[in-house]
Amino acid sequence: MFRGQMFAVQRMGSALMHGGGGGTRIIGVAAARATAPTVGSSPSMASARFYHPKVIDHYTNPRNVGSLDKNLPNVGTGLVGAPACGDVMKLQIQVNDETGVIENVKFKTFGCGSAIASSSYMTELVRGKTLEDAAKIKNTEIARELSLPPVKLHCSMLAEDAIKAAIKDYQAKRPTTQLK
């Protein structure tokens, strides 16, 4: 719900329709940001003004959203969750069996802006990497790049856990492709 309103602010540029107690009126972007519900309107999320621009970019324009056919032998699926906050992340990789390189990657995440941004950023990191290199990615790299605050580090940990789970699933389908 709030995400659509954030998009409205960005798309409309200089004005936004605002339905207040006295009817609908057009207000400027600065006022729209002050009056329209932001990401921070949800108790599970920090206010948008506290997010780093890279988080907002990956949240509003997530890369590689979608699913791959989990039944394909060269697709690994990692499904992880954080019971503390309710975030759930599914990350899928499609691997070239001959080279061991991740050629395609998709994700679906139910969670806060930081979880979505961490998922999106992880997909960019792993595409084109070997399984061995992808398995070496640490949550600290994601957290540093996205400037996640300490309270959101679990989101980057989910992304690390998801890629490791996807690699493990791929390897379980193809037992001869274990990491060294």
Swiss-Prot record:
Chief location bin: mitochondrion
Alphabetized InterPro entries for the sequence: ISCU, NIF_FeS_clus_asmbl_NifU_N
Pathways per UniProt: Cofactor biosynthesis; iron-sulfur cluster biosynthesis
Example of a GO biological process term: iron-sulfur cluster assembly
Pfam families for this protein: NifU_N
Role noted for this protein: Scaffold protein for the de novo synthesis of iron-sulfur (Fe-S) clusters within mitochondria, which is required for maturation of both mitochondrial and cytoplasmic [2Fe-2S] and [4Fe-4S] proteins. First, a [2Fe-2S] cluster is transiently assembled on the scaffold protein ISU1. In a second step, the cluster is released from ISU1, transferred to a glutaredoxin, followed by the formation of mitochondrial [2Fe-2S] proteins, the synthesis of [4Fe-4S] clusters and their target-specific insertion into the recipient apoproteins.
Subunit text: Component of the core Fe-S cluster (ISC) assembly machinery.
Protein name as annotated: Iron sulfur cluster assembly protein 1, mitochondrial
